[in-house]
Amino acid sequence: MDNPSPYLQLRIPKPDKQALSFCDASVHGLTEWVAGLPKANLGETARLLYQCLVELNQLETPASNRMKLMELLRPEVLFVCKHLEKHFLNQSVVLDERPRKVANLCQALQNHLAIGYKLIVTQEASQFRKEQPQPLAIALQRSLHSMFGPLVRACQLYCPVPDGLWLEMHLVYRTAVAFNLQHIAVTDPLSHYDAPHSVENAYLAAMLLGCARTNQMRQNAIANLAEAIEGWAPLVHLQTADSPASLFWIAIRQDAPPRLKSLFKDSEKQYLLGINPTPLLDAIEEYLQADASKRAFARLPVTERLTPEQIQHLGAAWGDTAERTFRRIPAQGTMTICLGMSAVHYFLAGEKDFGDVLKAPDEPRNANFASKKKGAPDIWANSFDAQPVARWEPGEPMEEIKYSSPETLIADNNLDKYPVYELLIVNHSPSGYCLSWPREVPSQLQAGELLGIQDTAKQGWSVAVARWIRQVRGGGTQMGIELIAPSAQPCGLQLVRKAGESSQYLRALLLPEIEAISRPPGLITPRMPFQE
């Protein structure tokens, strides 16, 4: 970090306008404009905020005034982005045109928000005074926080991080270090935590997210992590790369996230910063080992929505330095898959419905609509439309009704209910495959989803799980799957309660023992009601 002026490398426009077109460039003028935003129409509000930020970033104004204006706009931008998320999250991994435009709008809003704060960074840094460090420290922290939003959104959409985002974050942090401001406490009213914040903690939150293997997490889990990680950053230390406790390295002059230090080539081992997550890993271990009743008192700040399974994944991502067990081998060909427990159960059972597997099919019952008393008058006989219609003349066309047999209807319904997909094989290893979706991705697909896979139509179905999902620039959507078992026995499982009624039979899979890897027999069940 020998460059004394990293802030000069930030990507920002050169302001050249003297006034704003929509309001006076003052706190009073912008406050009135914000009060008039059509909050009930989020789309229009987002459009107006976008135009406002673009103009404001082209405005020539002192840093102190720009900071006041940005602080007025920041909560409005975060509010709009938060409420627009429902239009593109928890949908298909590959978004349709309209959701994609909404997601791009949110990214653009927070990108321009970050540009506004980076303009303040360059203004304050060029006239910095040690006796007044707060303005620059706040601008640095706000810049990182504004860039954190697009990073989280890219993770949730399993798409590449915007070009230059990592490098801009590194430059902002290097600016803080150059002025010795990385540990200065600043307040942030929009944070999830009341504790004082710092530039280093904001930077560490982004770096931790970058090496959390979010492509193996579901969208809601990533949102929960983004909310909690801000409070975890103080448990992580930035240090020199040559320290033995540095599990991850950051190439601070490259547009890249942190990586395990074992993944760096010799030619890349310069201008590095180390991450020591050991205190955080210890806190995670303590939390997971504590009784559920005592976890609220653990030193790990955790939101209620972050589950122990998700925390366990994070502990492995930040602490597991084991190399890949098997090498990936490029491959060609196709593979057939089905998604979800219901579909996997159906195909493993030889395309039988769950009721047939239980050997308890529903028995047909005949409805009897006869009157209780023979000879009793029909109460509907005097209805205005109860008389027979005799207006049809011979030779008039008649509508033909085509009936389908029940077997045909059931087969057609099952094809719609349990679709199969043919995917391209990118590479494989003994433990799994990398597959590519050539067409639309079903909305059901998420990391952790149970899969059935079939190499050829003559072979049986194997059981697998989707470990990660990513969107490749120009290459569509790819998915990494891990093989769980070469086969499984479909069955029904019932939760028997000592008091009260037992549960209904639910789908489950019996996994065979695999002696070659010393794995005992297993059982896959739905999460509810079969909890540990």
Model-found features: residue ranges?
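Intrinsically disordered, low-complexity regions
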Residues: 5-9, 17-19, 27, 31, ...
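Long, leucine/valine-rich, helix-dominated scaffolding and oligomerization segments
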Residues: 2-207
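Extended, domain-scale alpha-helical bundle/helix-rich regions
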Residues: 179-371, 376
